[in-house]
Amino acid sequence: MEQLLSLIPEAAVTHVQSLLSQSNLSIKITKKRLTKHGDFRRRVDGTSMITLNATSNPYRFLITLLHELAHFKVAESHHYRVKPHGIEWKNAYREIILPFLNQKIFPNPLCSLLALHMKNPKASTDQDFNLVMALRKYDAKTEKVVLYELEDGQLFYLDNGRAFIKMKKRRTRLECKEVESGRLYLFSPHAEVSIPPSTP
């Protein structure tokens, strides 16, 4: 519990302690995973587990925690099968996050963008471009750039060393061509990538 509370905004600690005291579940904090910020699952024995990525961004961590607590609440109150991010989850998420939606916990414009997001919350905050960019300001500083900031035709690299060229926008995604294979892939516009160092 102490580690978890150290990762959220100080103004949210009392609210979170109250929420967790009413919840019979285990919470595990793990190293960063590329595919998700957190997850909830029911174990075979019927107990519940939330796993959260450790992050230096207290606002991202808190949002993820509340997102997963909403899954827990739905699992506790609905014994029949419901959609993972259906209306039951959306309602539970709104109810849980409402006491946190103030500028003492989330500074503006983050608070306003989060309130807007909660009108119809997505399965992941990563699907909300404006919210993602606002949250990114509180991430640890990095030399990486956001893909949408690159010019069409510009070269970039993923963490695994694969090289791509940014091509064009397709609806909400960016089409990019892998240099080695020539295959086309769709990327999130806010994907963090590396670019070659500038030559003097």
Say what each PLM segment does:
Residues I63-E76:
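Active-site recognition of the HExxH zinc-binding catalytic motif
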Residues P58-F61:
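Conserved short loop/helix modules at catalytic or binding sites
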